[in-house]
A protein has these predicted regions:
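N-terminal cap/lid segment of alpha/beta-hydrolase-fold proteins
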Residues: 1-26
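Short alpha-helix in the alpha/beta-hydrolase fold that links the catalytic acid
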Residues: 47, 205, 218-228
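Alpha/beta-hydrolase active-site loop
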Residues: 83-107
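Alpha/beta-hydrolase fold nucleophile elbow
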Residues: 107-118
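Hydrolase active-site cap/lid region
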Residues: 131-182
């Protein structure tokens, strides 16, 4: 048994961020690595209860803050360091995942990994899962189906290029968070690597795709596309939103029912791999 909370790993550009790992007494040798989404963090909402769910089922569970998500090692919640948020790229997030795997390797021997990515984290789960040998399966929760489609087009893209930065508002904190144009140039430089359709169509690892029926942040069509490319069935969680009825902060002691159903469906997928 092992429980590590708010330890520090070194991610992209040697930036330090917070990480949790729990290994249960009855460990089945498999560790789930959870990747949060855009403007998220490891302790958002009910993610701690997701961790508890899988640990109780015998899985190890690791959740971490991406290195350039706006958090610090002193404060991993919300966005106390907007400059780091502005410097984020998909390559940074991919490097973070690689470093997290190495960090786990230093703590645990002979483990098999599974990645779960929420929203934008689902894209990182697919990109990283394609090449990281310790990853044996990929689960996407309310994930985007394309990185390129999320960028502005036309005059808005030219304005971003000209200014070098644009701003996105966090509805909960009301912060105007910067995004540098390097986010886009990093994508264009690595467009083949970041092509989710290509990954889903060629990867030889099992993929589980789930989406909330009433998701207004990332439309369910994204889930349909990922499932079709992966030649698998989409797991639709009925009558729920992008975060499966969870909110931040989450003060209840139990998972919201849609998120519980998602955990059960994901666990069923993982069990069937054995």
């Amino acid at each position: 048994m092992m429980k590590i909370q708010n330890d520090i790993y070194t991610g992209a550009q040697n930036r330090k961020s917070l990480i949790d790992l729990e290994i249960p007494e009855e460990f089945n040798g498999e560790i789930i690595i959870f990747i949060h989404g855009f403007m998220g963090f490891k302790d958002w909402g009910a993610w701690h209860l997701v961790m508890d769910y899988f640990v109780q089922k015998g899985y190890g569970f690791c959740k971490f803050n991406i290195s350039h998500g706006g958090g610090t090692v002193e404060n991993g919640i919300d966005f106390p360091d907007p400059d780091s948020f502005g410097n984020n790229t998909f390559s940074h997030e991919l490097e973070d995942l690689n470093q997290v795997v190495r960090w786990i390797d230093e703590k645990v021997s002979h483990w098999k990994g599974h990645v779960i990515g929420h929203s934008k984290g689902g894209a990182i789960a697919l990109i990283g899962g394609e090449k990281i040998e310790q990853v044996h399966s990929i689960s996407t929760w309310a994930a985007i189906a394309s990185i390129g489609e999320r960028f502005p087009k036309g005059a808005q893209l030219e304005k971003w290029k000209s200014n070098g930065v644009k701003y996105v508002k966090n509805g909960r904190t009301q912060q105007e968070l910067p995004q540098k144009y390097t986010l886009y140039t990093d994508y264009m430089t690595n467009e083949h690597t970041f092509d989710l359709e290509r990954i889903c169509g060629t990867i030889d690892k099992p993929i589980f795709v789930a989406h909330g029926e009433k998701d207004t942040s990332v439309d369910i069509n994204n889930g349909n596309r990922l499932a079709n490319w992966s030649r698998t069935n989409l797991c639709v969680i009925d009558k729920t939103d992008h975060v499966f009825d969870s909110r931040h902060p989450w003060t209840q002691t139990e998972l919201p029912n849609p998120l519980l159903q998602l955990c059960k469906s994901t666990e069923k997928f993982l069990k069937e791999l054995k």
